[in-house]
Curated annotation (Swiss-Prot):
The organism's taxonomic lineage, starting at the top: Eukaryota, Fungi, Dikarya, Ascomycota, Pezizomycotina
Source organism of this protein record: Gibberella moniliformis (strain M3125 / FGSC 7600) (Maize ear and stalk rot fungus)
Compartmental location: Cell membrane
Domain of life: Eukaryota
Ranges annotated as spanning the membrane: 98-118, 135-155, 167-187, 195-215, 227-247, 254-274, 337-357, 367-387, 410-430, 438-458, 468-488, 503-523
Family: Belongs to the major facilitator superfamily. DHA1 family. Polyamines/proton antiporter (TC 2.A.1.2.16) subfamily.
Protein name per its UniProtKB record: Efflux pump FUB11
Record-level GO cellular component terms: plasma membrane
First-listed, main subcellular location of the protein, grouped into a coarse class: membrane
Region feature (Disordered): 1-45, 570-593
Glycan-carrying positions: 19
Disulfide bridge map: none
Compositional bias per record (Polar residues), positions renumbered to this chain: 9-30
Function: Efflux pump involved in export of fusaric acid, a mycotoxin with low to moderate toxicity to animals and humans, but with high phytotoxic properties. Constitutes a self-protecting mechanism of the fungus against critical levels of FSA within the cell.
Amino acid sequence: MAIDPQPSSPSLSSETIANDTIGNDNNVNEPSVEPKTQEHQHTVPPRLSRIYSQAHHISKSFIDQNYPGEGTTQAPYRINFLPDDSQNAQLLPRWKKWAFVLLQSLACLATTFASSAYSGGIKQIIRAFGISQEVATLGISLYVLGFTFGPLVWAPLSELYGRKKVFFFTFMVATAFSAGAAGAGSIASLLVLRFLTGSIGSAPLSNAPALIADMFDKSERGLAMCMFSGAPFLGPAIGPIAGGFLGETAGWRWLHGLMAAFTGVTWIACTVFIPETYAPYILRKRAQHMSKLTGKVYISTLDADKPPSSAAHQLKNALTRPWLLLFKEPIVFITSIYISIIYGTMYMCFAAFPIVFQQGRGWSQGIGGLAFTGIVIGVILSIISFAFEDKRYARAARSRGAPMEPEDRLPPAIMGSLLIPIGLFWFAWTTFPSIHWIVPIIGTVFFAWGLVLVFMALLNYLIDSYVIFAASIMAANSALRSLFGAAFPLFTRQMYDGLGVQWASSIPAFLALACVPFPFLFYKYGRQIRMKCEYAAEAANVLQKMRSLHVAVTEDDAMNEAEEMWRARTHNSHASAAHSHGHRRSLSYTRSA
C-alpha cells in the first residue's frame, strides 16, 4: 500500500477508493471479454464503418467482442476496457503518466499561486482605489473563500461529464476572469472577479488527485501524490516572491496579467495533451455510441448495477453530505479543525510578513517577498520526507501480510505536530530587528515542514478510516480549511497592532501547541474511537464486506445503510423507552390499588 495524500477535497471518487481496498479497479466479478466468434459478429451498416476510427474513438475491435449479455434492454451487453485498451488510463506509458501529473500539478500551482501573488500589489491597490488595508486584503480572502465552494461542485460534475470537459471550461473561464481583474475599474469589480476566479479556477484542486487515482494503481500512487501535494503549498509560498517584485516595478495590473498568463498557458497545455482519464465516464460514453452504431443495447459494467443518478442528485449530496459527516463524526471534526488552524496560519503569513519584514526591518516590497523562501524550503523538505515515509509504510505493509490500520498513517503527523509550534514560537520570538533576519526565516522552515507532514498524514488517516465516505470527508475538510484560510488574513493587521509582533505571532503557535495531543491520542486510541463513530464503524463494516465478498459498494449505498441502521437504533431506543415507561406506570397503578 502507498501513502495517498490529498490536498484538496473531494478529489477521489468513492468507487476508486473503495475498489482500491480490494485490489481491483474496474473488473469486480466481471467475466472476461473475448473476441466474438463469427456467428456473434454484429452487422454494422457499411456507411458507418468510416466512423470507427473517428467518432468517439470507437474502433471496430470494440464492436467485435464477446461481451456478457444479449444486447437487449433487459439484458444489455456489459462492456469493459479491452486488455490493451488505449483509452484505459491505467495502461498509459509511465512517461505519459508522469507528464500528465506534472501538467496537472502546474495547473494546481497556477491556482494557488494566484491566491497569494495578489499580496505583492496590495500597496498599489490601496493607493489606486483609496481603500483600507483590510478591504484590500479581501482580495486574498475572497479568492481562498472560492476554494470552499468550487471543489464541492466541480468534483461531482467531473464524474458526470468527465475530468477533461470540466477542466477545459472552468480554467478557460478562470483565465478570462483573471485577465478581467487586471482591467478592473473599481475595488468592487476587482473583489468580485477575485472570488469568481478562485471558485471557478479551483477545479484542479479536486481534478488533479482524481486524475492521479485514474492513472496509477494504489501501489504506485504514493510517489505521484507526494509530487503533486507540494503544489497547493508551493504556489502560495512562491506567489509573494514573484508578486512582490512585479508589483513594485510594474504595478498591480501587470501582476494580474501574470496570473492570467500563467493560468492560460497551463489551461492550453493541459487541454491539448491530457486525455480523458475517468474510466466510468469513458465506458459510459462508449456504451452510448456503440448502441447508436449497432442498434444493440450496451451498458458500462461500472453502471450496470447502479440506479441512474442526475446532476441535481449528485450536487445535492456533494453540498450536504460533507457537512453531515463533519459535525457528526468527532474524528473528522477534530482533524479538520487542526488542519484548518495550521492552513489558516499559512495564509495569515501573507498579511504578517509585510509587517514583520517590510515595516519592522525596512525591506522593500520585492525583497520582502523573499521572506517566504523559508516556507518554500520547508515544503520541499516535507515532500522528500514523505517519499521516504511512503517506502517505510510499504515495507511495513508487506512484512505484516495483513491490512494496515488507519492509525499506521499517523507517525508523520506526530512529528509534524511538534515541528509546527517549534517553528512558530521560533519565528515569533526572533522577529526583533536586532536579531539577524535569517533566524526567523529558519523558524518558518520548521513550520512549513510540519504543516505539510500533518496535512498529508491526517488526510491519509481520514481516507483509511472512512474509505467509502472518503470523497465527502475530503470535501468537508477542504471547505472548512478554506474558510479558515479566508478568515485569518482579515484580522492579522488588528492583532499585530494590538498585541505587538511577538505576541501576535505567538497566538497561532499556542493554538498549534494545543493541538499537539490529537495525533498521539488518535495513534493510541484511534481504533476505539472509530468504533464508536457511526460512519467510521459503517465504513469498517463495508470494507470488511468488500474484502470478504469482493463486491463493490458505492458511497450512496453505504450512506443509506448507515442511515437505516441509525433509524433502526433510534426506533428501538424509543420503543424500549416507551416500554419502560409503560411498565413503570403499570407498577404505579398496582401499588395504588
